[in-house]
Regions:
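Outer-membrane beta-barrel transmembrane strands
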Residues: 53, 123-145, 204
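Residues on the lipid-exposed face of transmembrane beta-strands in outer-membrane beta-barrel proteins
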Residues: 68-74, 88-90, 134-140, 155-159, ...
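Predominantly the C-terminal beta-signal and adjacent terminal strand-loop region
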Residues: 36-39, 179-239
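Structural signature of outer-membrane beta-barrel domains
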Residues: 48-50, 89-95, 141, 160-164, ...
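Extracellular/periplasm-exposed beta-strand and loop segments of Gram-negative cell-envelope proteins
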Residues: 54-61, 96-129, 162-190
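Short loop/turn motifs that connect adjacent beta-strands in outer-membrane beta-barrel proteins
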Residues: 25-39, 75-82, 143-151
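Bacterial Sec-dependent N-terminal signal peptides
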Residues: 1-27, 234, 238-239
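Glycine- and aromatic-enriched membrane insertion/assembly motifs of diderm outer-membrane
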Residues: 49, 58-117
Length: 239
């Protein structure tokens, strides 16, 4: 019995000693980076609206836009809540509308308005684009070194270079698909605005130049196609 008491005393003393020693271990404090930057990856989803449409042209379905990339943050003040953002990204945009792009025997693209006067039925007509984009943003936010959750308003300018464009037509005359049509304006640019809290932000893009080159006109009326896009949606910023 005496042996058990001595053993119990030794174990109890050792346990209490360990607990006391563990309690003396200092807990490291949270490191705060006063020179933080909001370098961010971004992902966006938009509904694409066509404006400045030629006579008889209309959108015929949901037109989707997707974008993603990375933006480097360059703070401009000591508080670091005002900054410039420089980035690079990729975008995909589809446009469902009734401008039928058909190439003639000389491989020249013609642009037909598929309105009520068009004599053949069709079930699908759209074009879509792939672009490399360079966004530039002026950034205002309520961020602090301690928090990653804040309100933001980012205004900016975006330049995009189309490296691929594709048109699709499906109807009574058959299925027509063309790649890299010369009539598209390869250089596209516009104004941007994103505003919101934390990850979720509303996004607007307003194009400043038309989708097609200046010499592109409708086939029958010879009307210049000056249409451009407004994109409305959501953009997500991820640290």
């Amino acid at each position: 019995m005496k042996t058990y008491c001595i053993l119990f005393f030794i174990i109890s003393f050792g346990f209490s000693k360990a607990c006391f020693s563990q309690g003396d271990i200092p807990v490291p404090s949270k490191v705060i980076d006063s020179l933080y930057k909001e370098d961010q990856f971004y992902l966006g989803l938009t509904y694409n609206i066509l404006v400045k449409l030629p006579t008889g042209v209309k959108q015929t379905g949901f037109s989707l836009g997707l974008q993603g990339g990375f933006i480097k943050d360059i703070p401009l003040n000591k508080r670091r809540n005002i900054a410039i953002g420089l980035g690079i990204g990729y975008s995909y945009n589809s446009y469902n509308q009734n401008i039928g792009i058909i190439k003639d025997d000389s491989n020249e693209a013609k642009y037909f308005v598929l309105d009520d006067t068009y004599e053949f039925d069709y079930t699908k007509n759209n074009f879509y684009q792939h672009a490399i984009e360079l966004p530039i943003e002026f950034r205002w936010r309520t961020s602090t070194p301690e928090s990653y959750r804040f309100w933001r308003i980012y205004t900016g300018f975006k330049v995009g270079y189309l490296f691929s464009n594709i048109s699709n037509f499906k109807g009574e005359v058959g299925s027509l698909r063309y790649n890299d049509i010369d009539g598209f304006n390869d250089l596209q640019y516009g104004l941007t605005l994103s505003a919101g809290y934390n990850t979720w932000n509303f996004y607007v893009y307003y194009a400043l130049n038309p989708m097609f080159n200046d010499d592109v006109k409708t086939a029958l009326k010879g009307e210049r196609i000056e249409m451009s896009a407004i994109k409305l949606g959501l953009i997500f910023y991820i640290l």
